[in-house]
Amino acid sequence: MLTIKVASANPAKINAVASAFAEIFPTETLDVKGIAVPSGVADQPMSSDETLLGAMNRVAELARVEADFRVAIEAGLDGDFTFAWMVIEHQGKMGKARSASLMLPPAALSQLQQGKELGDVMDAMFNQDNIKQKGGAIALLTQHKLSRSSVYHQALILAMIPFLNPDLF
């Protein structure tokens, strides 16, 4: 059995991790659990560097927890775009990948620059409740063609590259 700890209690993130690891390890029994840990950065990171730091900090917070893999997903902004960093730790090695980016409407960006969080802004713009734990801004802006979990799934597999090719890393 592989134990995977996710540095979040957000179901969208936990489901993305479970889905990606099930694809990578189709014959393994997986125990995927989320644990809320602090990021050490702003609730709404405003740059790629700050977002990556938040993911790295979350994985570091999980170091005290027994697991085969420790995973953090930190969403943030980079200019007019939102995206997320994936950081995976396994036996002291790190894998990282950045998700696809999506443009945000100018009305949303102006509210984010005033200190609001993207999930709250999207809830208000689209008359939703807690979208960040469902399909996310991605689902709303793609008219549900993609979801937060589906976009994170791909990036998580990319973050696993060092572990899938250990002789190269």
PLM features: what roles do these ranges have?
Residues 1-67:
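N-terminal polybasic phosphate/anion-binding patch
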Residues 43-169:
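Anionic-ligand binding patches
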